[in-house]
Amino acid sequence: MTIDAHQHFWRFDPVRDAWITEEMNIIRRDFLPADLAPLLKAAGIDGCVAVQADQSEAETQFLLECAQGNDFVKAVVGWVDLRSPDVAERLAYWAEQPLVKGFRHIVQGEPDDKFLLREDFNNGIAALKKHGLTYDILVYPHQLPAVEQFVEKHPEQPLVIDHLAKPYIKKKEIGDWTKQIRRIARMPHVHCKLSGMVTEADLQNWKEADFRPYLDTVLEAFGPGRLMYGSDWPVCLLAADYTRQKAIVDNFIGSLSDTEKSRIMGGNAAAFYNIS
């Protein structure tokens, strides 16, 4: 099974979705399963993982509703307040929904660089394992020192870094990011998504060669057994259509074995998110 391990749906709301600025006009509209289905079919992708873009439990419910009648939506990564004293109760509720496979918090937007080390947040993370739920780590490179400490606290919790931790590709900054990624990747329970790269590059003038040093780094650090392809659609449309962004990964993994390619393009995501 081939899987796009990272995409979003939304009904655009200019207030709730204030992060989608006027400069992002191409994505200031609704994006729903009917929009994605033909793109997946054309790309030879069997299914996808729908990831939260809004921090509310209503978002988790919305993604489940998107999955109804759309069998290609194989998993939902929702949102729940992991800092809440009621987190155990809320996780028990969502764990009853078979498609809810994990959760994500938009840590990249937190002003505290050490947000991931908060005691209340870590209590919530510790409660995920009971229900077999995963956690997606969304951060910027300057937050990676906290990520290293965070992943060490939860050695049995399945964790995945979204978008290679958003390296500053446009600026060609790689040194500090590389050191941190290598340190974090030493921990076998941490995975990484090959996603979200085009929007960290020069949106209008990127070249595939721009991504190679970063892709080489994560392949060496995580190996083909802990990487998973994700489109970050529709956010990717700011810099590339579905076909162009997928081609970056396809071309990069072209020299790998068929087994390794199969794992990156779906097998790893299926195992991580418990997709059957």
Please place each PLM-identified region on the residue numbering.
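Divalent metal-dependent hydrolysis catalytic cores, especially in the metallo-beta-lactamase
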Residues: 21-29, 34-55, 73-81, 101-105, ...
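Catalytic pocket-lining loop regions of alpha/beta-barrel enzymes
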Residues: 115-228
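Conserved, mostly hydrophobic/aromatic
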Residues: 6, 48, 63, 76, ...
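Alpha-helical scaffolding within the catalytic cores
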Residues: 32-36, 58-59, 86-89, 144-145, ...
